[in-house]
C-alpha cells in the first residue's frame, strides 16, 4: 500500500487518484453519514427515555435536547482525531466489560423455549419463506458487524505513530474484528434467551435499543438502572467513532473542491453536518428503516464490492485473487438485492 496524505481513508486513498479519489471519498461520506444518524437518533431516544422513565424529568423537550447533545458531540469531533481516539480508548474497555456483564447477568434467566419456539415456527414455515426472511435481514447483519469507520482511524493512528506501524495496524484490525464479532454474538444470544419477546416489540415500536427497555429480575434488578446508561455510553462512543472519519473526510473533500483554506472548509463542512444531523435526529426517523434502506446496502458496497473491484484491477493486490473474492461479491450483491426487493 502506498502512503498517502489522506489519513481518513488510508486504504482507498492508495488506489484512487484525481477524480476517482474525490468520488470514492464522496461515496464514503454518503455511506457512513447515515450511520451517524442512526447512532444520533438512538442516543437521543435513549437519553430521553432515561430522563422521563428513570429520572422522571419531563421539562426538556426533544428539540433542545437534540440540539445540546448533537452540538456537544460535534464540539468533541472538532478537537481532532487524537482527542477522539483517546476518548474512544477510554470508553472502549469499560463499555465492553459492561455489555458483557449484562449478557452474563442474564444467564440465570435464560429460557431455551425462546429458541425452541422460534425453531418450531421455522419448521412450520415453508423453506422458501424462511430463506427469504433471512435474506431480507442481510442489511441489518451487515450494519451490525461493520466497524470499518472506527477501526480505520485507530489503525491509521498506529500506522503513523508507531514503529512497524503496518504490523500494528493489522494487529489492531484483527483483534478488533474478533472481539466485536464474539461480543456481539454472545450479547445477542443472551438477550434472545433472557429477555421477553414483548420487550423487543416495545423497543421497535418506540425506536429504542434493547438496553433502554431492559428490566432486571430478582438479584439483577440493578440492570434496570444501569442498562440505559450503558446504552447512552455505547451510542456516544459509536457516534464519535463513525463521525470522526465522516467529519474529517467530508472536510478534506470540501477543501479540495472549494479551493478555500482547509480550516475554513472544514468549519463549513462541520457546520453543514451538524445542521443535517440535528434536523434528522430531531425528526426521529425509524432506525431500522434507516439501516435497511441506506446503511446496510451502502456499507455492503464499501465492504464487499469495492474491495473486490480493486483486487481484480490493481496488480499490487493480485495475490488476493481467488474464490474468496467471488464469495465476497455474492455477499455484497445479496445485501443489495434485499434492498431492491423491499422497494418493489
Regions found by a protein language model. Give the residues of each.
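TM-loop-TM module centered on a large, flexible mid-protein loop between adjacent transmembrane helices
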Residues: 3-18, 177-234, 296
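Hydrophobic alpha-helical segments and their helix-loop junctions in multi-pass secondary transporters
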Residues: 40, 74-77, 93-125, 141-145, ...
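Hydrophobic transmembrane alpha-helices that form the core helical bundles
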Residues: 1-56, 228-253
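Helix-loop-helix connectors at the membrane interface of multi-pass transporters/channels
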Residues: 13, 41-62, 156-163, 171-179, ...
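Selective recognition of specific alpha-helical transmembrane segments in multi-pass small-molecule
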Residues: 36, 95-105, 171-198, 271, ...
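Hydrophobic, small-residue-rich membrane helices and short re-entrant helix-turn-helix hairpins
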Residues: 7, 79-89, 119-122, 150-179, ...
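Hydrophobic, membrane-embedded alpha-helices of multi-pass small-molecule transporters
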Residues: 28-32, 105-110, 119-191, 227-242, ...
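Membrane-interface loop-to-helix entry segments
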Residues: 43, 47, 63-109, 292-306, ...
Amino acid at each position: 500500500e502506498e502512503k498517502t496524505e489522506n489519513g481518513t481513508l488510508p486504504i482507498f486513498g492508495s488506489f484512487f487518484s484525481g477524480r476517482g479519489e474525490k468520488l470514492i471519498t464522496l461515496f464514503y461520506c454518503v455511506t457512513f453519514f447515515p450511520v451517524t444518524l442512526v447512532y444520533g437518533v438512538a442516543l437521543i431516544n435513549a437519553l430521553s427515555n432515561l430522563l422521563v422513565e428513570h429520572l422522571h424529568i419531563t421539562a426538556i423537550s426533544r428539540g433542545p435536547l437534540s440540539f445540546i447533545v448533537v452540538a456537544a458531540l460535534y464540539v468533541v469531533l472538532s478537537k481532532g482525531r487524537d482527542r477522539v481516539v483517546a476518548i474512544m480508548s477510554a470508553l472502549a474497555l469499560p463499555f465492553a466489560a459492561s455489555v458483557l456483564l449484562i449478557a452474563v447477568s442474564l444467564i440465570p434467566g435464560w429460557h431455551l423455549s425462546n429458541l425452541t419456539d422460534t425453531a418450531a415456527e421455522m419448521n412450520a414455515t415453508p423453506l422458501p419463506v424462511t430463506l427469504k426472511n433471512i435474506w431480507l435481514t442481510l442489511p441489518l447483519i451487515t450494519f451490525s458487524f461493520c466497524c470499518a469507520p472506527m477501526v480505520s482511524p485507530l489503525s491509521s493512528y498506529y500506522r503513523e505513530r508507531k514503529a512497524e506501524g503496518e504490523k500494528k495496524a493489522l494487529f489492531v484490525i484483527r483483534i478488533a474484528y474478533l472481539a466485536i464479532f464474539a461480543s456481539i454474538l454472545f450479547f445477542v444470544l443472551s438477550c434472545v434467551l433472557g429477555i421477553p419477546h414483548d420487550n423487543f416489540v416495545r423497543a421497535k415500536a418506540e425506536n429504542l435499543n434493547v438496553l433502554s427497555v431492559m428490566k432486571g429480575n430478582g438479584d439483577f434488578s440493578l440492570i434496570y438502572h444501569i442498562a440505559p446508561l450503558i446504552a447512552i455510553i455505547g451510542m456516544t462512543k459509536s457516534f464519535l467513532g463513525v463521525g470522526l472519519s465522516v467529519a474529517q473526510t467530508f472536510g478534506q473533500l470540501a477543501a479540495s473542491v472549494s479551493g478555500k483554506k482547509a480550516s475554513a472548509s472544514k468549519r463549513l463542512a462541520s457546520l453543514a453536518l451538524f445542521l443535517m444531523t440535528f434536523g434528522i435526529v430531531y425528526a426521529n426517523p425509524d432506525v431500522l428503516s434507516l439501516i435497511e434502506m441506506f446503511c446496510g446496502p451502502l456499507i455492503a458496497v464499501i465492504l464487499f464490492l469495492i474491495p473486490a473491484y480493486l483486487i481484480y484491477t490493481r496488480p499490487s493486490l493480485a495475490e488476493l485473487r481467488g474464490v474468496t473474492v467471488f464469495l465476497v461479491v455474492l455477499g455484497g450483491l445479496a445485501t443489495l438485492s434485499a434492498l431492491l426487493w423491499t422497494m418493489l
